[in-house]
Amino acid sequence: MPAVIASNPNAYALERARKAGIPTYVVARKSYPSSKAMTVALVEQLQALHIDLVVLAGFMVILTSEMVQAFPNAILNVHPALIPSFAGPGCYGLHVHEKALEYGVKLSGATVHFVSEECDGGPIVSQKAVEVLPDDTPEILQRRIMENCEWKLLPQAVSLFCQGRLKVEGRTVRILD
C-alpha cells in the first residue's frame, strides 16, 4: 500500500497507517475553494504516487468527474446498503440505516462497487446482506453491517483487483478464476 489519504485529519486510518510505516496525506475539502480544486490536488497526489487502485472507505465526498475519469474502473467504494437501495446523494453514514429502518426492510447490507460519475451508480463488485432485527436502531444496524459486511467485502474486492481477477463488462463485474 503506497499511501493512505484521508479527507478527515482525525481519521483512525491515518494513525494505523503511520504505525505501519505507510505514508499518509490529508486532502481536506475545507482546505480548497471548491470540490474541483480539491479533486485536482487529489488526482495530482495520486498520480505522483503512481497509484493503480483508489479505495474509498468512509470518504464522505462525492468525487468529481475529473477524478473518476483519471482512474476509470480503478476506484472502489464500499456503501453501507444493498445498492440500488438507499444509495445516491444524501445516502451516507447513519442516514442510510435510518432510511432502511423507516422503510421496513428485512435485509440490509453492504455493496462494494467501482465508482462512476453517478453517485453510488458504478458496476457492483460484491454484496453481502444481514438480517434487520426488530430491535435495531440505526447505530446497531450500522455496526452489524460494518463488522459483518463492509470489513469483509472491501478487503476481498481489493485482493481480487490486485490479482487482476475483476473484469468490468458494462454494468457487470465478472470475477475471473
Task: Outline where the language-model segments fall.
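One-carbon transfer enzymes
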Residues: M1-D177
